[in-house]
């Protein structure tokens, strides 16, 4: 499948990226793709015209255009679960009808969005108060796709907050909910329980704890709880009125669900109008993905760059480095989006893959990461392709000098990764500091940077609701393109099941009501340790 590209890699792996710029003064322009004022610059990679042509050929060989059309048309492309993949319908604000199994779904999508809008507006205005007055705080309880997306987006769009404060609880560790609820008023807090099945053990454990906390503190759970779930029988049994339950269809996967009711906390924080702008930004990326030629298509070129670095060059990970503190949760969000989607070892037809599908995705916001792991990125033996992102302008005009420093650092890091520092330059630096003789050579070698390390840069005017929508949709479609080329199902997640099953069986063992004798030696010994130490007074 990749033979021609491997041959190109063999022929070009020794050249310097800097030389590509010297040979082509228009390289930055020719190896970028734009959507309006958003630009993806992938020129600081080894990709040239021949490599790009070879990568684009993968799209045609994998019938990407047909599979893209099938996804948007509601075909059951999630073959292992027999489901359509239509998170794009949730942001189809002014598009045409969308059908699943012959039924038009946009009427329900618009109805749900209108219900969310009315609920959010009433909550924000004080028309839906808690037992102690207008709601001041919202606690979203969920995990995975029910937490990572809204938590990331609420933080990212902090400059647009004009509603109640939003908090997020995901971990079943009691410390998480205890720390979150501490200081909140139980009579003026809304709790949103986000679980499609309303059975997720972490979420339901936290939900019951929050309900008890609210009842003890004078709140009214019937007025102050809402749910995002399709299990209306379970939400009713929990005590949540039907008019406060917001559902979504099984053709919306959890990690793709931010655009609908899972985004209720975001709508409450920023308001329905800005939430609409968020959806419109994503819809703009959808239309771009559907219409732009491959070489100018942002999701396609971001995906092909990823394929080149992981499948062809053999780099096992990639770092997502947003130079925006408010995007601090984006790397974790993309970890789920990419690693849960494409962390597969079996092709769509059930045969084993002959190499890893998705890479390890990790990262931190700049400039913090520069003082943590950039040492390895610059001078480690392994190459880590980096994906920088930065806005030309921040939201704090009186702190514009901060933002200029932020941009300078972002651009400097991508340049330094490419440029490096040769030994003769390192020797000159050491000599200028008064180092001489054998010590000069030793010191110089510590100051050598290999350079020639690839990176992309996503740059845009400002992080607005619409721009955040574009960014998230860009990465969603990137995952889809990579999955199509690799021949895998990007929309199931069987890898999360086994651990959940074993955790359920271990519950009684950890409680001490069942024996650990049937477990392996290590697990049994760890259980024995827990039972022996958990009641020990450590004060």
Curated annotation (Swiss-Prot):
Pfam families reported in the protein's UniProt record: PGI (PF00342)
Pathway listed: Carbohydrate biosynthesis; gluconeogenesis; Carbohydrate degradation; glycolysis; D-glyceraldehyde 3-phosphate and glycerone phosphate from D-glucose: step 2/4
Reactions this protein catalyses: alpha-D-glucose 6-phosphate = beta-D-fructose 6-phosphate
Any one biological process term the GO annotation gives: glycolytic process
EC numbers on record: 5.3.1.9
GO cellular component terms given for this protein: cytosol
InterPro entries named in the record: G6P_Isomerase, G6P_Isomerase_C, Phosphoglucose_isomerase_CS, SIS_dom_sf, SIS_PGI_1, SIS_PGI_2
Top-level taxon in the UniProt lineage: Bacteria
Key words of the record: Cytoplasm, Gluconeogenesis, Glycolysis, Isomerase
Subcellular location: Cytoplasm
GO molecular function, one term: glucose-6-phosphate isomerase activity
Main location: cytoplasm
SUPFAM superfamilies, sorted: SIS domain
Catalytic residue positions: 340 (proton donor), 371, 500
Role this protein plays: Catalyzes the reversible isomerization of glucose-6-phosphate to fructose-6-phosphate.
Similarity comment text for this entry: Belongs to the GPI family.
Protein name, per record: Glucose-6-phosphate isomerase
Natural source organism: Ruegeria pomeroyi (strain ATCC 700808 / DSM 15171 / DSS-3) (Silicibacter pomeroyi)
């Amino acid at each position: 499948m990749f033979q021609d590209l491997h041959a190109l890699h063999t022929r070009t792996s020794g050249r310097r990226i800097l030389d590509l710029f010297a040979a082509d003064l228009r390289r930055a322009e020719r190896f970028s793709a734009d959507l309006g004022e958003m630009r993806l610059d992938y020129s600081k990679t080894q990709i040239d015209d021949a490599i790009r042509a070879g990568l684009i050929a993968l799209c045609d060989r994998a019938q990407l255009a047909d599979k893209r059309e099938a996804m948007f048309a509601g075909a059951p492309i999630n073959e292992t679960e027999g489901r359509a993949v239509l998170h794009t319908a949730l942001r189809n604000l002014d598009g045409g009808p969308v059908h699943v199994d012959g039924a038009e779904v946009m009427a329900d999508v618009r109805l749900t969005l209108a219900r969310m809008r009315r609920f959010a507006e009433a909550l924000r205005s004080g028309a839906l108060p808690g037992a102690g007055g207008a709601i001041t705080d919202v606690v979203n309880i969920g995990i995975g796709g029910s937490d990572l997306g809204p938590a990331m987006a609420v933080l990212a769009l902090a400059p647009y907050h004009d509603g109640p404060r939003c908090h997020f609880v995901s971990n079943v560790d009691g410390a998480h909910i205890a720390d979150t609820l501490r200081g909140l008023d139980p009579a003026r807090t809304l709790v949103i329980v986000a679980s499609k099945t309303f059975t997720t053990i972490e979420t339901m454990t936290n939900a019951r704890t929050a309900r008890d906390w609210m009842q003890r503190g004078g709140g009214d759970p019937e007025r102050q709880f809402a749910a995002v779930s399709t299990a209306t029988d379970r939400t009713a049994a929990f005590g949540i009125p039907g008019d406060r339950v917001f559902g979504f269809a099984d053709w919306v996967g959890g990690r793709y669900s931010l655009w609908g009711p899972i985004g209720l906390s975001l709508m409450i924080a920023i308001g329905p109008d800005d939430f609409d702008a968020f959806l419109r930004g994503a819809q703009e990326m959808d239309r771009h993905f559907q219409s732009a030629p491959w070489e100018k298509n942002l999701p396609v070129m971001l995906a092909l760059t990823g394929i080149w670095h992981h499948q062809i060059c053999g780099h096992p990970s990639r770092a997502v480095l947003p130079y925006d503190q408010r995007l601090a949760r984006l790397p974790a969000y993309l970890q789920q989006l990419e690693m849960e989607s494409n962390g597969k070892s079996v092709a769509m037809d059930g045969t084993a893959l002959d190499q890893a599908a998705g890479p390890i995705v990790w990262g931190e916001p700049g400039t913090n990461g520069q003082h943590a792991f950039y040492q390895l990125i610059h001078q480690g033996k392994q190459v880590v392709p980096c994906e920088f992102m930065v806005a030309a302008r921040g939201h704090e005009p009186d702190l514009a000098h901060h933002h200029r420093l932020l941009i300078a650092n972002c651009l400097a890091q991508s340049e330094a990764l490419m440029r490096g520092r040769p030994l003769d330059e390192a020797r000159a630096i050491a000599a200028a500091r008064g180092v001489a003789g054998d010590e000069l050579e030793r010191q110089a070698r510590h100051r050598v940077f290999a350079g020639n390390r690839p990176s992309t840069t996503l740059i845009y005017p400002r992080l607005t609701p619409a721009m955040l929508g574009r960014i998230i949709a860009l990465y969603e479609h990137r995952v889809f393109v990579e999955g199509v080329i690799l021949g895998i199902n990007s929309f199931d997640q069987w890898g999360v099941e086994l651990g959940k099953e074993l955790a359920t069986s271990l519950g009684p063992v950890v409680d001490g009501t069942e024996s650990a004798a049937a477990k392996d030696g290590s697990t049994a010994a760890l259980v024995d340790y827990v039972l022996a130490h958990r009641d020990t007074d450590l004060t």
